[in-house]
Amino acid sequence: VNSFNGLCTYDENGEIAMDFAESYEASEDGLSYTFTLRDGLKWSDGTDLNANDFVYSWNRAASAETGADYAYMFDPIARKDDGTLDVTASEDGKTLTINLVSPCAYFLDLCAFPAFYAVPQASVEAADGWQDNPGAWCQEAGFVSSGAYTLESWTHNESMVYVKNPNYYRADEVKIERLEFMLSADDTAIYAAYNAGDLDFADTVPTDEIQSLLDNPEFHIIDNLGTYYVAFNVNSDLFAGKTPEQAAAMRRGLSLLIDRDYIVENIGQTGQQLANTFVPAGMADGNGGEFRQNDDAYTYPNADAVGYYDPSDDAYFDNLAEAIELLKEAGYEFVDDGNGNEVLSDATPIDITYITNDGSAHVAVAEAMQQDFAAIGANLTIETNEWNVFLNERKAGNFDMSRNGWLADFNDPINMLEMWTTDSGNNDVQFGR
């Protein structure tokens, strides 16, 4: 729901368009941007919204004291001598000037991303405990916002009700006055509510219902740019005693055991592409082409598959054989199981804890991987938790392997790659920690 807005947004064709900014100018060297804001912008409580709100909000999001997961996204912006962002509002609050460290091809995309939206300073700092809990101001309904809708009521884990914001600058174009949402991690319950006529729209269905819905005109498949993946905790005891080379061989070997084709055909069932790179197919390279391709600058190790391995069903047994050899390199011993298959020796077992949230598709993926690992005698124990517990466990690094996924915030490969810096709030695999 559009409760907040930024300087920029996207039009119906996915192209950058102006939002709270009516125009911008960029310097010839690409190091400076100046946005001119629209006249008459208001917060939902009727107070004025201007460029100073963006100066405050961006510095708040980038501050280590706030601890925002997306603080690293502000790194393209230069810093002043006092450590604050080099972002300045004009005296009248009409213009916002930003100086960058270096030219940034995706800077306007950042200005359309929610982490770069403005938040109301007065409301933020009026909340009890705001200095220790940066989100205290918006944990209940009624908080001040800036978008098309405001949150009227919120029964946590059950429902949310949004109503039209009369102070939104495009309020005359908002045709739906009220939006009611059911909140549930149970996709079976959501689907039942939809079928009962209690919901007009549902964005998830149980895995075992997908096949029966493929020909239903009410069922729509929407493409997303992103990657569903397994995260290895690099500090896990799973890698204790291993050299960096052995740990890398082990991760690749375990990854090659996963039958991605089975997961896509029997669990996803809606045309997902097999992943063999972290940056997904279709992501732009910033120069008018696609990032994931073989060219003069780089050819993928598996050139035919345009990736690091061939994930197709035809390559399954080759991948299995390579996985066993890699695990041997990592120090694991294998024996014949009596049927001509190599399995792990009792002397060098592999026991893995895999965490996931309790959505039916995620659990099904975990169970498929459990069977894949069992093919060589490796044991995968699945721990399932509700969403918030799962997120906390993953962020704390309390796992060997974890289900993970990333839908691109904007169409540039840096969005998939910069999260793996040591100080990134999205560095769930614990690199550098």
Region annotations inferred by a language model:
Residues 22-70, 97, 193, 244-246, ...:
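Aromatic- and charge-enriched surface segment that lines or borders ligand/interaction sites
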Residues 87, 252, 264-265, 316, ...:
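Extracytoplasmic/peripheral linker and loop segments enriched in polar/acidic and small residues
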Residues 25, 71-126:
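Surface-exposed binding/hinge segments that line
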Residues 11-15, 112-174, 178, 196, ...:
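Gly/Pro-rich hinge or "lid" segments in bacterial periplasmic/extracellular proteins
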Residues 135-140, 166-212, 370, 379-381, ...:
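Ligand-site clamp/hinge motif
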Residues 246-371:
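Append "and occasionally in soluble cytosolic enzymes with long acidic Gly/Pro-rich linkers
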Residues 11, 163-167, 225-253, 257, ...:
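A bilobed periplasmic-binding-protein/Venus flytrap-type ligand-binding module shared by bacterial periplasmic
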Residues 1-28, 144:
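N-terminal lobe/hinge region of extracytoplasmic solute-binding protein
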